[in-house]
Amino acid sequence: MVSFEDLLNYSLNEEKNKITEEFKKILSEMNQIIDEAYAEVYREYSAKITDLVNKNNDRIRGEIAKMEIENKRLISKEMDYWIENVKENAKKSLYEFVKTDNYKKGLESIISREVSDGSIIYCSPSDQKSISDIIKKKKISCKIVVDEKIVGGIKIYYPDKSLSKDFTLETILNQVFDDIRDKIAQILFGE
């Protein structure tokens, strides 16, 4: 026969086993809920962090692009400064060139070829006498007007045609300089 105590122990063990099984199930469900909640929070914050990182990367790329453009602008500005410096030095050398025999021969050639009776010649103050001598020698009837802005060379105006031709050294220098600007940049900057 089974004693009361054995029966009680058996009954208690049965209940204990049921409670333990229920507790294991509850613990397993709680762990699953915690794992799912953790995974959801992890996904949510991972997405937020990824979004934040992407936004910051886009902002940084934008800043880098702005800086590169600004850098190119500054470099271009500096290159222009040095190229203009070369041009100004070339312009200063014109003052020496107008004193040479080659210049005077070139001036006479232009006058012989381009100036006709009734023309108006604009020239520098230093060239006025030379031009006057050339037109007397060539027997051309024209007017000479001094232009303080001209370093060398001449401008010719044909009133009958309302036409003007510019043979000033400044204009020639500007045209030549514009044509070879890229070559000058290559020499100065290796580009």
UniProtKB/Swiss-Prot annotation:
Q: Which InterPro entries match?
A: ATPase_E_C, ATPase_V1_Esu
Q: How would you describe this protein's topology in the membrane?
A: Peripheral membrane protein
Cell compartments where the protein resides: Cell membrane
Work out whether the entry's keyword set contains Calcium: no
One cellular component (GO) term of this entry = proton-transporting two-sector ATPase complex, catalytic domain
Q: Does the keyword Ion transport apply?
A: yes
**Ranges in a coiled coil:** none
GO function terms (MF aspect): ATP binding; proton-transporting ATP synthase activity, rotational mechanism; proton-transporting ATPase activity, rotational mechanism
Determine the domain of life of the protein's source: Archaea
SUPFAM superfamilies attached to this UniProt entry: V-type ATPase subunit E-like
Alphabetical UniProt keywords: ATP synthesis, Cell membrane, Hydrogen ion transport, Ion transport, Membrane, Transport
PTM per Swiss-Prot/TrEMBL: The N-terminus is blocked.
Q: Name one GO biological process term.
A: proton motive force-driven plasma membrane ATP synthesis
Please state which protein family the record places this protein in.
Belongs to the V-ATPase E subunit family.
Record function comment: Component of the A-type ATP synthase that produces ATP from ADP in the presence of a proton gradient across the membrane.
| Subunit description | Has multiple subunits with at least A(3), B(3), C, D, E, F, H, I and proteolipid K(x).
Question: Any idea what this protein is called?
Answer: A-type ATP synthase subunit E
Task: Look up and give the organism this protein is from.
Answer: Sulfurisphaera tokodaii (strain DSM 16993 / JCM 10545 / NBRC 100140 / 7)
Q: What gene makes this protein?
A: atpE
